[in-house]
C-alpha cells in the first residue's frame, strides 16, 4: 500500500467542516479545524495538558483556526479561541459534530 494513503498533511493548514442542522442538512456555518493526529494538533493538545486545561471544549477550541457563518443575536460572531471555547460549551450539538470530525483522520487525508 502506498504511504500517500496515510498522508494527513492537509490537516496542518486546517480543513473546513460544514455544520449540519437537526435535519442533517448543511448550514452556512463553516468551521476550520486542525487534524488531531497532525503535528500542530498534537502540539495544541500537549500544551493544554501541560496547562491542565484538557476539557473537551478547550481541546476543540485549540484545534479550531477560524469560522464563518456564525451569528449571535443577529450579529456576526467573530472567531477567537475564547469564543470557540464558549461556542463548544454552549452548543453541544455543534461540539459533537466537530469532535466526530477531528477524530476521523480520513477527513484530513490528502486527495
Regions found by a protein language model. Name each.
Residues 13-24:
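Short acidic-hydrophobic surface loop/beta-edge motif
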Amino acid at each position: 500500500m502506498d504511504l500517500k494513503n496515510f498522508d494527513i498533511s492537509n490537516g496542518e493548514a486546517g480543513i473546513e467542516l460544514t455544520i449540519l442542522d437537526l435535519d442533517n442538512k448543511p448550514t452556512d456555518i463553516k468551521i476550520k479545524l486542525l487534524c488531531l493526529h497532525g503535528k500542530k494538533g498534537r502540539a495544541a493538545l500537549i500544551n493544554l495538558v501541560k496547562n491542565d486545561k484538557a476539557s473537551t471544549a478547550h481541546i476543540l477550541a485549540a484545534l479550531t483556526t477560524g469560522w464563518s457563518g456564525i451569528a449571535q443575536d443577529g450579529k456576526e460572531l467573530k472567531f477567537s479561541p475564547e469564543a470557540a471555547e464558549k461556542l463548544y460549551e454552549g452548543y453541544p450539538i455543534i461540539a459533537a459534530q466537530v469532535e466526530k470530525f477531528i477524530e476521523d483522520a480520513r477527513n484530513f487525508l490528502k486527495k
